[in-house]
Amino acid sequence: MLKKNLQLNEKILVLIILVFSLIINQYYANRGVFPIESFAHFDIAFRIINGDIPFQDYWLVSGLFIDYLQAFFFKVLGQNFQVYIFHASLINCLLTITTFYILKNFNLNIYQCFFYSLCFAILGYTTSGTLYVDHHSSLLCLLAVYCLIMALKTDKKKFLILLPVILGLAFLTKSAPSVYVFFSVSLILILYIFIKKKFIWLLYLILSSLSFIIFILLFFDFANIKLENFFEQYLLFPSSIGKNRIAELNFLSGDIIFDYKFIYISFIPLLLVTLLDVIKSKKNIFNKNFFFFLSFLLLILSLVIHQINTRNQEFIFFLIPVLCAFSSIFIYNYEIKYKKYFSVFLLLFCLFVTSKYHLRFNDERRFHEMSKINFDLSVDAKKIDKKLSGLNWITPIFPNSPEEEIKFLREIIGVLNTENNKAMVMSNYSFLSLVIDKNLHSPSRWYIPNGAAYPIENNKYFDEYKNFLIDLITRKKISVIYIISPVKVDELYRYVSKDCFEEDKTIADVKKLLIKDCSYFKRPI
């Protein structure tokens, strides 16, 4: 009878977790937008459905997996903003439920599993709400580490088979932090396999890796994605930026030590228990607990380094509930006095930190630069188009006058709807193609003048992007280019001489450039 009640309780708790993790992300994703980030995969997914090819029809440095998966969601569920954010909500739900079952498998009290999972749902994808490559890749890396520790714990081959696939998908989402986590996981596996003589594991890992690579190569062939474009845009160009940023890292700086102090505090009990276990074990230092500890240590290092390199708002605080939970597991499994008090402290600490970051990143939407916005001023985005219905429109661009921004956008949509020539639009309002049901041939997902999205001057791949842009304009027979504020005309003129364009009159804060005969282009326009 008791066992049946526990099973019933577990099902109820899982149902609550499922609903909560979906709803909280869906709710906060509708709470204002930062156009450059909030719509990053919106138009791109629409363009893929309509035949555009990544690396060929738009410059791509990250997000390949998200783009195709979102295209699938649009194809199956419809093309609107609520379907778009449901994708992120589903990932939040998947990782939250997985966290619950991982903790339960490590024999943590079911109600603590429930509590820590809810905290995870609050700090997971919800801090962005909308699809974002750093969240997506980091959460997939966490899922890979879950597979690793379950393989170590259970010795089941299914986790070894899943591990390369998940890491591969994380890499196809964003090369960093997945590369850091890949090397971390590889180090742990090599140590474990050779120390424990689990050489059969190599077979499963190699077969799974080869199968995944073959599948991706076949998919690239099917999707007409050229490998040379993939290597240049997805690997070589981002690494040219990442090398410089890693070289500038100071591991003793305040950014690394103090900004992530709550992550370190949640990890300290796990560290101390592991040290005590190593001292006590003496000859059996490399037990499973040591490898669990090493897995989380290297994951923390990987994500902290990645977080600092991105130079974005913080997004890795979802580690805190996971680390608090595993610290509690380690404490319960070790002979320590007052272990219940330590467990209560971890629960209260996690509650405090989750509340703190929930208010800062979810309520204030700090990740998307909206911490100073009055959300009471927001307006239903269906005033722009019914496909954006449900989104409470307010942005950092027009923080005090969303109605004025909506009027501006409706004017732009009207102009683009009546444009009969082949047009290219350079804008961070990356929903215009889907809204007007017309490919606007944007050469990049987003426009950032710092050189992170595409090469700028002094980057060795500058000429490659220049040639890509000119080829795109020529191949698509573009006759007119619209540049919408806050994107600057320099995002075009740094690659193509302004003598190739004639400015035409249009609405305020929009540049309309007619393409003239020009030596830059292979054909007269």
Question: What are these model-predicted stretches?
Answer:
Residues T98, S137-T154, F159-L167, S186-I190, ...:
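Specific aromatic-rich, kink-prone transmembrane helix
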Residues G129-S137:
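Short acidic/glycine- and proline-prone juxtamembrane loop motifs at membrane-interface regions
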Residues S62, P177, N224, L351-R523:
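Extracytoplasmic
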Residues K104-N107, A144-L160, A170, L272-N284, ...:
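Membrane-interface transmembrane helices that cradle and orient dolichyl/undecaprenyl
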Residues A29-I44, F55-F72, Q79-Q82, A223-L227:
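Extracytoplasmic catalytic/substrate-binding loops of multi-pass membrane glycan-assembly enzymes
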Residues A121, F159-P177, V181-S186, L297-I308:
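Membrane-interface alpha helices of multi-pass inner-membrane proteins
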Residues T99-I122:
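Transmembrane-helix signature of polytopic, membrane-embedded enzymes
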Residues Y111, C147-L169, F199-L207, F286-L297:
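Short hydrophobic alpha-helices at membrane interfaces in multi-pass membrane enzymes
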